[in-house]
């Protein structure tokens, strides 16, 4: 799951530019596969729209095996007032391995005077529609923090961005290789964070759209990833998954 464009998008929207699109290709060292991510943001006078789509490419399969999508709308038709940093937020996310979810809430955006440092907080009600796993007494809330810093430590073209999600869950962990109906353990909270570091290497050869970098996916009891359909146990507890890749800004 990626939200790296979100803060850049907020900056772009605030500066009057209408849209931004990028594509990323990452190699996941833990899972041993490539992930293609497409991100898009569009700002308007009523707020902004953001989406991304992750597509997983296991090397032992001839076609992409799994996908995950998030699309969100920030509603803010009071831009230019003292309440401009505060927006309403509505979001849908899901995929062919993940449960569909609707989220409703608010977000608050902070930034430096030149928008080179950005931070947003979101608090949302989350409604999960589970298909494979079951829900048992969960708190239907999600807290999200997203950040972005341009020219990190004074290095031109070095960007540090990422997000942290914490949400209530009622997942009953099962092992489909043994018995899909056998409940093993219930988790009530899930955490996912993906700090990213990108360097605009293309600035050195007249190709400013190209960046090189990567991310570290840090999670707790997160069932995401194409391998979740074969082994739910793999992501129980705390896990770290480093990734390396390229990004192209259109």
Label every model-predicted segment.
Residues 4-13:
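Sec-dependent N-terminal signal peptides
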Residues 15-19:
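Sec/Tat signal peptide C-region and signal peptidase I cleavage site
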Residues 38-42, 71-75, 104-110, 123-125, ...:
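Residues on the lipid-exposed face of transmembrane beta-strands in outer-membrane beta-barrel proteins
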Residues 22-28, 32-77, 81, 85-89:
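Transmembrane beta-barrel domains of Gram-negative outer membranes and organellar outer membranes
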Residues 32-36, 63-69, 98-104, 137-143, ...:
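Residues that define the transmembrane beta-barrel architecture of outer-membrane proteins
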Residues 46-48, 76-87, 111-120, 150-160, ...:
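Short loop/turn motifs that connect adjacent beta-strands in outer-membrane beta-barrel proteins
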């Amino acid at each position: 799951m990626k939200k790296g464009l979100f803060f850049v998008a907020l900056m772009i929207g605030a500066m009057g530019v209408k849209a931004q699109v990028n594509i990323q290709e990452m190699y996941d060292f833990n899972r041993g596969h490539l992930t293609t991510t497409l991100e898009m943001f569009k700002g308007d006078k009523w707020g902004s729209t953001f989406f991304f789509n992750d597509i997983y490419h296991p090397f032992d399969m001839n076609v992409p095996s799994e996908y995950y999508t998030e699309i969100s709308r920030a509603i803010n038709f009071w831009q230019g007032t003292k309440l401009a940093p505060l927006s309403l937020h509505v979001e849908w996310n899901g995929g062919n391995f993940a449960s569909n979810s609707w989220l409703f809430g608010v977000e608050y955006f902070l930034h430096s005077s030149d928008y080179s440092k950005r931070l947003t907080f979101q608090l949302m009600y989350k409604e999960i529609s589970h298909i494979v796993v079951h829900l048992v007494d969960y708190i239907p809330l999600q807290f999200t923090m997203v950040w972005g810093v341009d020219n990190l430590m004074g290095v031109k073209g070095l960007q540090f961005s990422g997000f942290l999600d914490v949400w209530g869950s009622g997942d009953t962990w099962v092992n489909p290789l043994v018995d899909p109906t056998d409940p093993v353990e219930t988790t009530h909270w899930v955490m996912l964070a993906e700090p990213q570091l990108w360097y605009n290497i293309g600035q050195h050869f007249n190709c400013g759209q190209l960046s090189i970098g990567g991310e570290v996916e840090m999670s707790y009891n997160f069932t995401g990833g194409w391998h979740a359909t074969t082994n739910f146990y793999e992501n129980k507890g705390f896990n770290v998954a480093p990734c390396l890749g390229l990004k192209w800004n259109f």
